[in-house]
Swiss-Prot record:
InterPro entries: GrpE (IPR000740), GrpE_coiled_coil (IPR013805), GrpE_head (IPR009012). Residues 1-12 have a biased composition (Basic and acidic residues). The keyword Cell inner membrane does not apply. One of its GO terms (cellular component) is cytoplasm. This is Protein GrpE. GO terms for molecular function: adenyl-nucleotide exchange factor activity; protein homodimerization activity; protein-folding chaperone binding; unfolded protein binding. The lineage of its organism: Bacteria, Pseudomonadati, Pseudomonadota, Alphaproteobacteria, Hyphomicrobiales. Gene3D superfamilies: 3.90.20.20, Head domain of nucleotide exchange factor GrpE. Keywords: Chaperone, Cytoplasm, Stress response. The gene is grpE. It is found in: Cytoplasm.
Length: 197
């Protein structure tokens, strides 16, 4: 059972013609308004700026943290070293308290004691230097308030003004920092010190 077109349905009756489905044409929405595009560009620029600032801040934080860790390694023992300096000073005072004629005496017990104190002092200074603590003796140097502490003035015309004439107590540095300033007497007489070149 076919019709003249050759189309039949199961019941043998001619099939109804089916109209082909045609999709509706796609209509483009109106172009975004210029204001909306400007707003998106502004948001993009702000996001880029925030990202760059965050990256820069993170890099600065990394550098600052590395510097703080380095400083902690170098200067972390400052408090302990300051306390140990008192021991070094006491050892030096003990050696200074022994009169020269007693050092020359043939007493083996006294000589052994003096040698023991000297050895202990050297060992202590070596241990301090191993950890970055260095002793400095500024005798004859130009007075520098950053590393010297003036205790008094020395009226000596043979020494240029502003020169360290006497050292009462040696100073100590840890790395590039002053751990303890040197206690000094500064010359107030004589010619002015020559300017360093």
């Amino acid at each position: 059972m076919t019709d003249s077109d050759g189309k039949t349905d199961k019941s043998g009756e001619p099939a109804a013609e089916v109209e082909p489905v045609v999709s509706k044409p796609y209509v483009m929405p109106d172009d975004p308004e210029d204001d909306a595009l400007d707003a998106l560009n502004k948001q993009l620029a702000e996001a880029k700026d925030r990202t760059l600032r965050t990256l820069a801040e993170m890099e600065n934080l990394r550098k600052r943290t590395a510097r703080e860790v380095s400083d902690a390694r170098t200067y972390g023992i400052s408090g302990f070293a300051r306390d140990v300096l008192e021991i070094a000073d006491n050892l030096q005072r003990a050696l200074d308290a022994v009169p020269a004629d007693a050092r020359a005496a043939p007493d083996p017990g006294l000589k052994a004691l003096i040698e023991g104190v000297e050895l202990t002092e050297r060992s202590l200074h070596n241990a301090l230097e191993k950890h970055g603590v260095k002793k400095f003796d500024p005798a004859g140097e130009k007075f520098d308030p950053n590393v010297h502490q003036a205790m008094y003035e020395v009226p000596d015309p043979s020494i240029p003004v502003g020169t360290v004439a006497q050292v009462i107590q040696a100073g100590y540095m840890i790395g590039e920092r002053v751990l303890r300033p040197a206690l000094v007497g500064v010359a107030k007489g004589g010619a002015k010190a020559a300017a360093p070149e």
